[in-house]
């Protein structure tokens, strides 16, 4: 009897596991053996089950044992936010605790490759954040409400009346086609309440890391260099000679942070 009950328990556990996987995949409308990609499409293979996979039998990326908190020390982060003067909108908004809480949901960030690779990726992330927020002075894009970031061709992520999808947070996430999937992945109403990113420092870092993980991480850790991260973040407006000053500023911050972390910045720094 006991053996039969044990067997029954094992069977029930297996059924529960399969049911959980099925429910996860079905949250995006996918079959149980399919993954919901970062863009909300169903399928199999690395394009669907790799980076950014939201549900289903997602691939689990290999990570090293680096502690992101040991690299982003209290002293490093304090120096970052100290750049913002008292008149800055973001003064007191961005915190190390918020960053580390957000980073906990992205285990591949700063933990892929060698220890030096980890340091370079973290330096790259904060170089862009430093540039985008103008040294951590801003939460929202300057004059953002006056700008139109609604791509009406993105029918999967339709814009909502009265909502502005301008830049917010450390990487200034923009456009409805980014707010929508970011909200779906993280768990907030990105299309209906994009302002939520500017109200919560944790959510601000989560959206930045969501964008980084889905659009920047793979290019950087594959050895394409810092220049590839510029192209992934704002290449259309800065790369190929469009805005050399902005590119130079990003590179300078990256080199500065690499020096602080004691790591060589590598090659292919520009775009």
UniProtKB/Swiss-Prot annotation:
Residues 25-60 form the Chitin-binding type-1 domain. The active site is at residue 132. Disulfide bonds join 28-36, 30-42, 35-49, 88-137, 150-159, 239-271. The keyword Lipid metabolism does not apply. GO terms for molecular function: chitin binding; chitinase activity; endochitinase activity. It catalyses: Random endo-hydrolysis of N-acetyl-beta-D-glucosaminide (1->4)-beta-linkages in chitin and chitodextrins. SMART domains: ChtBD1 (SM00270). Its EC number is 3.2.1.14. Residues 1-20 form the signal peptide. It holds the Pfam family Glyco_hydro_19. Glycans are attached at residue 268. It comes from the Eukaryota. The keyword Ligase does not apply. Belongs to the glycosyl hydrolase 19 family. Chitinase class IV subfamily. This is Chitinase 6. It comes from Oryza sativa subsp. japonica (Rice).
């Amino acid at each position: 009897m006991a053996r039969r009950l044990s067997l029954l328990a094992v069977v029930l556990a297996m059924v529960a596991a399969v049911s959980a996987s099925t429910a996860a995949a079905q949250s995006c409308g996918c079959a149980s053996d399919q993954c919901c990609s970062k863009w909300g499409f169903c399928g199999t293979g690395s394009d669907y089950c790799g980076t950014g996979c939201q549900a289903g039998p997602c691939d689990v990326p290999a990570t090293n044992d680096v502690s992101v908190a040991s690299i982003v020390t209290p002293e490093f982060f304090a120096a970052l936010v100290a750049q913002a003067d008292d008149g800055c909108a973001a003064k007191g908004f961005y915190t190390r605790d918020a960053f580390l809480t957000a980073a906990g949901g992205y285990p591949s960030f700063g933990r892929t490759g060698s220890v030096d690779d980890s340091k370079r990726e973290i330096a790259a992330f904060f170089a862009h954040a430093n540039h985008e927020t103008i040294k951590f002075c801003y939460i929202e894009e300057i004059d953002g409400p006056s700008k139109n970031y609604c791509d009406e061709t993105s029918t999967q992520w339709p814009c909502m009346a009265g909502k502005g999808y301008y830049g917010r947070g450390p990487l200034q996430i923009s456009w409805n086609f980014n707010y929508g999937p970011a909200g779906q992945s993280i768990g907030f109403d990105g299309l209906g309440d994009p302002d939520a990113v500017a109200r919560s420092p944790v959510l601000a870092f989560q959206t930045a890391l969501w964008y980084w993980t889905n659009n920047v991480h793979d290019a950087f850790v594959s050895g394409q260099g810092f220049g590839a991260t510029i192209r992934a973040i704002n290449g259309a407006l800065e790369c190929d000679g469009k805005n050399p000053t902005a590119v130079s500023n990003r590179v300078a911050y990256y080199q500065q942070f690499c020096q602080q972390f004691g790591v060589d910045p590598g090659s292919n720094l520009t775009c």
